[in-house]
Each structure stands twice: as C-alpha cells, then as structure tokens.
Regions:
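Transmembrane alpha-helical segments that form core, pore/gating elements
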Residues: 49, 107-109, 113, 144-201, ...
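Hydrophobic/aromatic residues within transmembrane alpha-helices
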Residues: 28, 37, 41, 87, ...
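Hydrophobic transmembrane alpha-helices of multi-pass small-molecule transport proteins
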Residues: 49, 70, 110, 119-140, ...
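Glycine-/small-residue-enriched transmembrane alpha-helix faces in small-molecule transporters
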Residues: 1-39, 143-170
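Helix-helix packing/entry segments at the starts of transmembrane helices
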Residues: 39-40, 81, 95-102, 167-190, ...
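Membrane-interface helix-cap regions at the ends of transmembrane helices
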Residues: 20, 24-27, 31, 45-62, ...
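C-terminal transmembrane-helix exit sites in multi-pass transporters
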Residues: 48-60, 84, 103-125, 251-270
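Specific transmembrane alpha-helical segments of multi-pass solute transporters/efflux pumps
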Residues: 16-17, 21-22, 50-100, 136, ...
Length: 287
C-alpha cells in the first residue's frame, strides 16, 4: 500500500474514532460543567501525551514549530471542545452533528490558506456538494429547525477545529502525527490543569457512570488516539483530500446509534450514505 492510500486508511480510522465524540460529549456534559469537561479532557490527554513523549524520549520541536503547535492547541485542544460543550447545553447530539458536515469544507479552506494546497475546481464542486447533501439530511432528521445560541457555538467550534486540523496536518509532515497532538496537549497542560482544579465539582457522588464514561472517551479517544491516525492521514494523503472523509462522520454516528441503541436505519440514510461516498471518491480523484 502506497503512502497516499495509507493516508486514506489512517484518515478513515481517525474519523471513525471521532464519530463518537459529540454523543460522548453530550452524555458527559449532563454530569459535568462545560468548563470542567473542556479542561479535564485536555488535562487527562495531556498527561498521557507527556508520559508517551518521555517514555519514547522524543526530542523537543524546533523553535519555529511552537507557534503552529499553539494554533493546534487553540483549535482542537481548547476551541472545539469548549464550544461543543457549550453548544450541547442548548441542543441534542443529533442537531450538533448537523454542523460536522461543514467541517470537511472548513478544513479544506484552511488547507488552502495555511498549507498552500491547490485542489482544482472539480474538487470544490464535489466538496460543496458532499457537505450540502449531509448538512441537508442531518438538518432534516434532527427535527429542530430553530436557530439559537447553541448554533453559534457549534459554528465557532467548526471554525476552530478546521483551523486546528489544517495546521496540525501541515506540521505532521515535519514532526509526525502523534507528536503534533502530544506536544499541543503538553503546551496547554499547565493552563488546563489549573482550569480543571478551578472548575472541579465539590463532589463526584452525583455524577452518573455514563457521564464518567463520556469523559473517558473524549479524553482518551477524541483528544488523543483519534489524532494519532487523523494527523498522520492528513500528512500522508493531503489535507484537503483527506478532510473529505469527515463527510462520513455524521453518518457513522447514526450507524453507531443503530448498532448500539438498535435505532432504525432508513432507506434514506442508505441513499445519503451512497451519495456521500460518491462525493468523497470524486473529491479524492480531483484533489
């Protein structure tokens, strides 16, 4: 398997892991304050990242790499978790997943602005078409067409995340995918530890098991392991191209719900999935 195809495989694994992020955050925020959840998930992942760096004796990034790492930290360690936690106080997970369909487009735009990538016009046609198909479908099935403060928070989350994805994918070509997220987490660790203590609830007695499981998932998988595969995939296959795999993330979320919660899988879901796969394949061809 060549480097380009490896990028698609790694990107797909990363997206599959991220697919559980919003449902897990929705469950976790029912038991934890958004500020504590944002800080704790980053602090837990940061401690694990620090241990990994020390055990493997990874050398420090070059001086010029710290600014890009700060952007990654701002985008995916702080911005996206914070704004999604705030948004999920005002909406259910299904409605929040609507906005995830805009993430591939946001990432591709930042790939052009920050990474200098130049996909051709057909790539943009299929990227916009794919985002439009998934957005329309998820907006329809969410059953909530009203707009409010939660929608603003989710839009901010997508902007921060797209920026962090593109910057991290670019830096991964130089220092490696898992190294990028580990160093970004370590960079933000002192601040996140402070916030974790500041927002820590007086007691955990009333915190449900499901909320704790949600916190563990977003800390270990969404904040750390998923990025090992995702940033490596972006570096190998191209940021704009691999970003289109995120179109599958909302549909994966529905598939997870169907498998674990025995929810009904409709024909419309299968049709939209097929259409999305075609858009991803076309974007891959023209990227």
């Amino acid at each position: 398997m060549n480097k380009f195809m490896n990028g698609w495989v790694n990107g797909f694994i990363g997206v599959a892991i991220f697919a559980g992020s919003l449902p897990a955050t929705r469950v976790a925020v029912m038991g934890f304050d958004p500020g504590f959840l944002t800080a704790a998930r980053a602090a837990i992942a940061g401690i694990l990242g620090l241990i990994l760096i020390l055990v493997l004796k990874e050398k420090k990034p070059a001086k010029q790499d710290w600014w890009p790492l700060a952007i990654v930290a701002l985008g995916v360690v702080i911005g996206f978790p914070l704004f999604t936690a705030l948004a999920l106080q005002y909406m259910n997970a299904a409605h929040s997943i609507v906005f995830v369909s805009l993430l591939p487009l946001a990432t591709a735009i930042f790939a052009v602005l920050r990474g200098g990538e130049k996909p051709n016009q057909f790539f943009w046609i299929f990227a916009i078409l794919g985002s439009g198909v998934v957005f329309a479908y998820m907006f329809f099935i969410s059953g909530d067409t009203s707009l409010g403060i939660g929608d603003f928070y989710m839009l901010m989350a997508i902007i921060f995340c797209g920026f962090g994805y593109a910057e991290g994918g670019l830096l991964s070509r130089k220092i490696g995918g898992w190294q990028v997220i580990c160093w970004a987490l370590i960079l933000s660790l002192p601040f996140m530890l402070f916030l974790t203590v500041f927002y820590m609830p007086a007691s955990f007695e009333n915190v449900s098991t499901s909320a704790l499981v949600g916190l563990i998932y977003v800390s270990l998988f969404s904040m750390l392991i998923g990025f090992f595969f995702w940033y490596k995939g972006l570096a190998q296959g191209g940021i704009a191209a691999i970003s289109q795999l995120q179109l599958l993330q909302p549909l994966m979320g529905l598939a997870i719900a169907a498998a674990l919660l025995h929810e009904h899988v409709s024909w419309s879901m299968l049709v939209v999935t097929a259409a999305t796969l075609l858009c991803v394949a076309a974007a891959k061809k023209f990227a």
